[in-house]
Amino acid sequence: MKRTILLLSLLLAAAAYAQTPEPAVNYYAKDGTVSATDGTVYCVDGADSPTITICNAENRYSTVDASPSLYYKDGRRLETVEEYESVNGAVADQEAFTRIFRDMFTDEQIVALRNLRLPLAVGCTVDPETGVQLEVKFAIGNYPEMTSLPPDFYRTFEKRLKEEVRWNVNDFAKQLKYMFGLTVLNFRKLPLTSELHQIKPGLEEINQGEEVGLHH
Protein backbone atom coordinates (compact mmCIF):
# COMPACT_ATOMS: atom_id res chain seq x y z
CA MET A 1 0.00 0.00 0.00
CA LYS A 2 2.80 2.39 0.92
CA ARG A 3 4.53 1.54 -2.34
CA THR A 4 1.33 2.33 -4.26
CA ILE A 5 0.94 5.70 -2.52
CA LEU A 6 4.58 6.55 -3.16
CA LEU A 7 4.27 5.62 -6.84
CA LEU A 8 1.10 7.71 -7.16
CA SER A 9 2.83 10.70 -5.53
CA LEU A 10 5.75 10.40 -7.93
CA LEU A 11 3.41 10.22 -10.91
CA LEU A 12 1.51 13.31 -9.76
CA ALA A 13 4.75 15.21 -9.20
CA ALA A 14 6.00 14.22 -12.65
CA ALA A 15 2.72 15.32 -14.22
CA ALA A 16 2.85 18.69 -12.45
CA TYR A 17 6.45 19.20 -13.58
CA ALA A 18 5.56 18.31 -17.17
CA GLN A 19 2.71 20.84 -17.16
CA THR A 20 4.85 23.73 -15.91
CA PRO A 21 5.40 26.01 -18.93
CA GLU A 22 8.92 27.06 -19.72
CA PRO A 23 9.52 30.81 -19.39
CA ALA A 24 9.42 32.68 -22.70
CA VAL A 25 12.74 33.55 -24.28
CA ASN A 26 13.65 37.23 -23.85
CA TYR A 27 15.63 38.26 -26.94
CA TYR A 28 16.17 41.77 -25.56
CA ALA A 29 17.27 41.01 -22.00
CA LYS A 30 20.33 43.26 -22.19
CA ASP A 31 21.42 46.38 -24.01
CA GLY A 32 23.60 45.89 -27.06
CA THR A 33 22.80 44.33 -30.42
CA VAL A 34 20.84 41.38 -31.75
CA SER A 35 20.79 39.99 -35.28
CA ALA A 36 18.08 38.68 -37.57
CA THR A 37 18.81 35.58 -39.64
CA ASP A 38 19.37 37.71 -42.76
CA GLY A 39 22.22 39.50 -40.97
CA THR A 40 20.36 42.71 -40.12
CA VAL A 41 21.65 44.07 -36.82
CA TYR A 42 19.36 45.80 -34.32
CA CYS A 43 20.43 48.02 -31.45
CA VAL A 44 18.67 47.37 -28.14
CA ASP A 45 18.41 50.02 -25.43
CA GLY A 46 16.53 50.14 -22.13
CA ALA A 47 16.45 46.40 -21.47
CA ASP A 48 16.01 47.05 -17.73
CA SER A 49 13.38 49.75 -18.17
CA PRO A 50 9.61 49.57 -18.78
CA THR A 51 10.16 50.46 -22.45
CA ILE A 52 12.77 48.89 -24.73
CA THR A 53 13.93 50.58 -27.93
CA ILE A 54 14.81 48.41 -30.93
CA CYS A 55 16.19 50.03 -34.07
CA ASN A 56 18.12 49.05 -37.16
CA ALA A 57 21.83 49.66 -36.57
CA GLU A 58 22.03 51.35 -39.98
CA ASN A 59 19.52 54.06 -39.01
CA ARG A 60 20.92 57.59 -39.12
CA TYR A 61 18.02 59.60 -37.74
CA SER A 62 15.78 57.10 -35.91
CA THR A 63 18.38 55.84 -33.44
CA VAL A 64 18.14 55.18 -29.71
CA ASP A 65 19.78 58.52 -28.92
CA ALA A 66 18.84 60.51 -32.01
CA SER A 67 18.47 64.27 -31.95
CA PRO A 68 14.84 65.40 -32.34
CA SER A 69 15.94 68.36 -34.45
CA LEU A 70 14.64 68.86 -37.98
CA TYR A 71 16.42 70.63 -40.84
CA TYR A 72 15.48 72.45 -44.00
CA LYS A 73 16.90 71.14 -47.25
CA ASP A 74 19.41 74.01 -47.28
CA GLY A 75 20.83 72.81 -43.96
CA ARG A 76 19.20 75.33 -41.61
CA ARG A 77 17.78 73.87 -38.42
CA LEU A 78 14.22 74.59 -37.35
CA GLU A 79 14.50 76.93 -34.37
CA THR A 80 11.04 77.97 -33.21
CA VAL A 81 8.01 76.25 -31.77
CA GLU A 82 5.96 77.75 -34.59
CA GLU A 83 8.15 76.05 -37.17
CA TYR A 84 7.80 72.64 -35.55
CA GLU A 85 4.06 73.09 -35.13
CA SER A 86 3.82 73.81 -38.86
CA VAL A 87 5.07 70.31 -39.73
CA ASN A 88 2.08 68.06 -40.35
CA GLY A 89 1.25 64.76 -41.98
CA ALA A 90 -0.52 61.42 -41.60
CA VAL A 91 -0.43 57.88 -42.92
CA ALA A 92 -1.96 57.93 -46.40
CA ASP A 93 -3.61 54.50 -46.42
CA GLN A 94 -4.91 53.41 -43.05
CA GLU A 95 -6.18 50.12 -44.42
CA ALA A 96 -2.69 49.11 -45.56
CA PHE A 97 -1.28 50.16 -42.22
CA THR A 98 -3.82 48.17 -40.23
CA ARG A 99 -3.46 45.17 -42.56
CA ILE A 100 0.24 44.94 -41.71
CA PHE A 101 -0.49 44.86 -37.99
CA ARG A 102 -3.25 42.29 -38.54
CA ASP A 103 -0.84 40.10 -40.51
CA MET A 104 1.98 40.41 -37.99
CA PHE A 105 -0.02 39.47 -34.89
CA THR A 106 -2.28 36.47 -34.32
CA ASP A 107 -5.70 36.84 -32.74
CA GLU A 108 -4.33 35.28 -29.55
CA GLN A 109 -1.51 37.82 -29.42
CA ILE A 110 -3.88 40.72 -30.04
CA VAL A 111 -6.15 39.59 -27.19
CA ALA A 112 -3.18 39.35 -24.82
CA LEU A 113 -1.81 42.73 -25.89
CA ARG A 114 -5.17 44.43 -25.37
CA ASN A 115 -4.66 44.00 -21.64
CA LEU A 116 -1.26 45.69 -21.56
CA ARG A 117 -0.45 49.38 -21.22
CA LEU A 118 1.34 50.82 -24.28
CA PRO A 119 2.85 47.57 -25.58
CA LEU A 120 4.07 49.00 -28.89
CA ALA A 121 4.95 52.30 -30.54
CA VAL A 122 6.52 52.65 -33.97
CA GLY A 123 8.64 55.67 -34.83
CA CYS A 124 9.78 56.43 -38.34
CA THR A 125 11.81 58.86 -40.41
CA VAL A 126 9.81 60.00 -43.44
CA ASP A 127 11.01 61.40 -46.77
CA PRO A 128 8.71 64.44 -47.17
CA GLU A 129 8.90 64.33 -50.98
CA THR A 130 7.84 60.72 -51.44
CA GLY A 131 6.15 59.89 -48.15
CA VAL A 132 8.34 56.79 -47.87
CA GLN A 133 9.40 55.64 -44.41
CA LEU A 134 13.18 55.69 -44.68
CA GLU A 135 13.81 54.32 -41.20
CA VAL A 136 11.77 52.54 -38.54
CA LYS A 137 12.26 52.31 -34.78
CA PHE A 138 10.26 50.20 -32.32
CA ALA A 139 9.52 51.04 -28.69
CA ILE A 140 8.10 47.96 -27.00
CA GLY A 141 6.72 47.47 -23.52
CA ASN A 142 8.98 45.24 -21.44
CA TYR A 143 6.44 42.42 -21.48
CA PRO A 144 7.07 38.74 -22.37
CA GLU A 145 4.45 39.11 -25.12
CA MET A 146 6.78 41.56 -26.88
CA THR A 147 10.27 40.50 -25.78
CA SER A 148 9.64 36.90 -26.87
CA LEU A 149 9.21 38.03 -30.49
CA PRO A 150 12.54 37.31 -32.22
CA PRO A 151 14.59 39.81 -34.26
CA ASP A 152 13.24 38.19 -37.44
CA PHE A 153 9.75 39.36 -36.43
CA TYR A 154 10.86 42.99 -36.18
CA ARG A 155 12.87 42.65 -39.40
CA THR A 156 9.76 41.53 -41.30
CA PHE A 157 7.73 44.23 -39.57
CA GLU A 158 10.25 46.91 -40.55
CA LYS A 159 10.42 45.78 -44.19
CA ARG A 160 6.67 45.78 -44.61
CA LEU A 161 6.26 49.22 -43.06
CA LYS A 162 8.93 50.64 -45.37
CA GLU A 163 7.50 48.97 -48.47
CA GLU A 164 3.77 49.40 -47.93
CA VAL A 165 3.15 52.52 -45.83
CA ARG A 166 3.27 56.04 -47.25
CA TRP A 167 2.68 59.40 -45.60
CA ASN A 168 0.87 62.47 -46.89
CA VAL A 169 2.57 65.63 -45.60
CA ASN A 170 1.79 69.32 -45.87
CA ASP A 171 3.67 71.85 -47.99
CA PHE A 172 5.70 73.15 -45.07
CA ALA A 173 7.04 69.66 -44.33
CA LYS A 174 8.13 69.29 -47.95
CA GLN A 175 10.76 71.97 -47.31
CA LEU A 176 12.55 69.62 -44.89
CA LYS A 177 15.24 66.98 -45.37
CA TYR A 178 13.19 64.52 -43.35
CA MET A 179 10.49 64.41 -40.71
CA PHE A 180 9.49 62.08 -37.92
CA GLY A 181 6.29 60.09 -37.54
CA LEU A 182 4.96 58.15 -34.58
CA THR A 183 2.30 55.48 -34.18
CA VAL A 184 1.22 54.37 -30.71
CA LEU A 185 -0.84 51.29 -31.45
CA ASN A 186 -4.01 50.67 -29.49
CA PHE A 187 -4.56 46.92 -29.78
CA ARG A 188 -8.12 47.30 -28.50
CA LYS A 189 -8.89 49.02 -31.80
CA LEU A 190 -7.12 46.38 -33.89
CA PRO A 191 -9.84 43.99 -35.06
CA LEU A 192 -9.72 40.25 -34.52
CA THR A 193 -10.61 37.94 -37.40
CA SER A 194 -14.16 37.74 -36.07
CA GLU A 195 -14.36 41.54 -35.95
CA LEU A 196 -13.11 42.31 -39.46
CA HIS A 197 -16.57 43.44 -40.58
CA GLN A 198 -16.02 46.38 -38.21
CA ILE A 199 -12.65 47.32 -39.73
CA LYS A 200 -13.70 50.64 -41.29
CA PRO A 201 -14.96 52.24 -38.05
CA GLY A 202 -11.85 50.95 -36.34
CA LEU A 203 -9.61 52.54 -38.93
CA GLU A 204 -11.25 55.90 -38.47
CA GLU A 205 -10.53 55.71 -34.77
CA ILE A 206 -6.93 54.60 -35.28
CA ASN A 207 -6.29 57.79 -37.23
CA GLN A 208 -7.29 60.03 -34.35
CA GLY A 209 -5.23 61.70 -31.67
CA GLU A 210 -1.94 60.29 -30.52
CA GLU A 211 -2.24 56.87 -32.12
CA VAL A 212 -1.07 58.00 -35.57
CA GLY A 213 0.71 61.27 -36.12
CA LEU A 214 3.88 63.27 -36.09
CA HIS A 215 6.25 63.79 -33.23
CA HIS A 216 8.99 66.37 -32.87
Where are these regions (language model features)?
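N-terminal hydrophobic targeting signals that begin at the initiator methionine
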Residues: 1-2, 20
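Sec-dependent N-terminal signal peptides
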Residues: 3-14
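Charge-biased low-complexity segments
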Residues: 19-216
